[in-house]
Amino acid sequence: MKRSASDSPLLFDIPLAPDFSEEKRLLARGLKHIVGIDEAGRGPLAGPVVAAAVVLDIDNLPNGLDDSKRLTAVKREALYETILEKAITVSVASLSARSIDASDIRKAALEAMRRASVGLTLQPCHALIDGRDVPPGLPCPGSALVKGDQRSVSIAAASIVAKVTRDRMMIRAGAAHPPYGLEIHAGYATVKHRAAIETTGPVPGIHRYTFAPIKGRYSV
């Protein structure tokens, strides 16, 4: 069963859970290795943007794949381990808060996705990317899929790997910078996080100085 376009502002159907339809269309054209690419961390005030690229084994797909945002942390962690075990190849890349400030978040996210794709241990035949943009410099042709993490199991797997990787990074950042609670909110603009910035100020290398409410009020 699928949600219809009437349930969505988008002009296509979205399955209740990601499936292998997009990959099957490419496989039918003789394209063997399909890589799913997604990122985590576009919106937070702190921390890196992390991208993952995953080539799944069509004969050994993990069960329960879904958009990482629709899964509990416990389920994401379990699926993360399963993906690493069952996937043909997985690659992760990140760009720091400083790199984001030096460019912009859109360009940084696309660059992280490109770096993840070129880090794979095999040459993919086609990339499925979550969102509206195909990152420049991919090692293969690519297709951008709006809501791709809800449509494609390959992108869903990448979303889980990116999210878990970034959450673990933010847990370590939280231990190093206790006042901000980074391990709890992963750098998003919660009330506690904003209050800590007001009291203590942002941390160079951790916070994004080009993001409101930091932008224009603090300098590195």
Swiss-Prot record:
Q: Which PANTHER family match?
A: RIBONUCLEASE H2 SUBUNIT A, RIBONUCLEASE HII
- Gene3D superfamilies for this protein: Ribonuclease H-like superfamily/Ribonuclease H
Nuclease listed as a keyword: yes
Can you name this protein?
Ribonuclease HII
Molecular function GO labels:
manganese ion binding; RNA binding; RNA-DNA hybrid ribonuclease activity
- GO cellular component term of the entry, any: cytoplasm
Q: What does this protein do?
A: Endonuclease that specifically degrades the RNA of RNA-DNA hybrids.
Q: At the top level of its lineage, which domain of life is listed?
A: Bacteria
Q: What is the lineage of its organism?
A: Bacteria, Pseudomonadati, Pseudomonadota, Alphaproteobacteria, Hyphomicrobiales
What is a single Pfam family found in this protein's UniProt entry? RNase_HII
Disulfide pairs here are none
Q: Which residues bind a divalent metal cation?
A: 38-39, 130
